[in-house]
Curated annotation (Swiss-Prot):
PANTHER family for this protein: F-BOX ASSOCIATED UBIQUITINATION EFFECTOR FAMILY PROTEIN, OS09G0372900 PROTEIN-RELATED
Protein name: F-box protein At3g19470
Record-annotated F-box domain positions: 1-44
Taxonomic lineage: Eukaryota, Viridiplantae, Streptophyta, Embryophyta, Tracheophyta
Organism the protein comes from: Arabidopsis thaliana (Mouse-ear cress)
Superkingdom of origin organism: Eukaryota
Length: 382
């Protein structure tokens, strides 16, 4: 290895899957140095993108309070499944590696938020809360002092975003409507209060999503005695102006808090929403045609509409329905639990009516799986 021309080992290492990069770095000091070189990293990520475009892509999955990198292969609209204990290479969803180690195997990860190839992880133990921003590609982490000590099952919202004018990442924190929103600037290394008096509150039971450096959540109007129904909408936080945008309409009406709603993104270009009414076993997914902090429009045709009663169970109701879609292959993958809440399941729906369920193993009853897209990044954490 030491006598080989530099470009030869670089060419070989470029073909290593992203999921195997960490053990390769620990094998040889020279390989580790080479893999952390900027020119190599650009070639490696370009090679990974070619592979992703060709047949498979990666997502980050939080499951049982741990974070994993999942490899997904949905070739030719043919979905083959295997149990998590199977070593079969035909499985369309594979748990490649546990992603994060905080130096404490007892530390549970209760929330994950992805932005620009960075992961914001909220880690909670009985004695402390930790905020960690992590770049999985470099293996770099940055710890932040939290402003509040949480219980694992508290309701709160965090988001990671990007200030385009200052080229700086920021963290937004919200707890309840009675607590002020706080924002953390990576450059100043300080938390500060935001001057916001909302006429709404974030629906904190539902996870938000990052798109183009901004964050989006489901929200609803503050309760008043004259309200006869819930009014849900999308809400954007612009990390550049540090302001919330106006309520953005959803493609469905009359949602209530018992319904299942989830938001995702596709190709870092558009938002996607999932909706299942609590009293009707119909699952619908829509994709935006335009999305900005102050405006949204939806494709006139629903991306996917299926009957869970026919495909899954006569009485099946998704709980959180964290998901992603593949527009080209016309497939949606929804992560949730089984009917008894004992197993983690990936439900794979095709727009043509096809269906498969991939068993991901035993489930911690108090932790629902959460999936987000993952695109490797060369961003350095200072």
């Amino acid at each position: 290895m030491y006598n080989l021309p530099r470009d030869l080992p670089e060419e070989v290492l470029c073909r290593i899957p992203l999921t195997s990069l960490r053990p390769v770095r620990s094998t040889c000091k020279k390989w580790s140095t080479l893999s952390k070189c900027g020119s190599f990293a650009k070639k490696h990520l370009a090679q990974a993108k070619v592979l992703a475009d060709a047949k498979e892509f990666m997502v980050v999955l939080m499951m049982n309070f741990r974070v994993y990198l999942m490899r997904v292969n949905l070739q030719n609209n043919v979905v083959e499944s295997s149990s998590s204990s199977s070593s079969s290479s035909s499985s369309c969803i594979k748990r490649e590696a546990k992603l994060i180690s905080l130096g404490d195997e007892e530390a549970d990860i209760s929330q994950v938020f992805h932005c620009d190839g960075l992961l914001l992880c909220i880690s909670i133990t009985e004695s402390k809360t930790r905020l960690v921003v992590w770049n999985p590609y470099w293996g770099h982490t940055r710890l932040f002092e939290p402003t509040h000590q949480f219980n694992k099952f508290d309701s709160y919202s965090y988001a990671l975003g990007y200030d385009k004018s200052r080229k700086s990442h920021k963290i937004l924190r919200g707890i309840t409507c009675l607590d002020p929103f706080k924002i953390y600037d990576f450059n100043s290394d300080l938390w500060r209060d935001l001057d916001v008096t909302p006429e709404w509150h974030l629906w904190q039971m539902l996870h938000g999503v990052s798109l183009k450096g901004n964050a989006y959540w489901f929200a609803r109007e503050n309760y008043t005695e004259t309200m006869d129904t819930d009014h849900f909408f999308l809400l954007c936080f612009d990390f550049t102006s540090e302001t919330f945008g106006p309520p953005l309409p959803l493609p469905f009406e009359f949602a209530v808090s018992e319904d299942t709603m989830s938001v995702s993104s596709v190709r870092e270009e558009q938002l996607v929403v999932l909706y299942q009414p609590w009293d009707y076993l119909q699952l619908d997914i829509w994709v935006t045609s335009k999305i900005e902090p102050n405006a949204v429009s939806w494709n006139s045709k629903v991306f996917l509409s299926v009957s869970l009663k026919q495909l899954v169970s006569p009485q099946f109701q998704l709980t959180f329905g964290s998901f992603f879609i593949d527009e080209e292959k016309k497939v949606a993958v929804v992560f949730d639990k089984d009917y008894d809440n004992k197993r983690n399941i990936a439900y794979i729906f095709g727009v043509d009516g096809s269906f498969k369920a991939v068993d991901l193993g035993d489930s911690d009853r108090k932790c629902f799986p959460l999936v987000c897209s993952y695109v490797p990044s060369l961003v350095q954490l200072n």
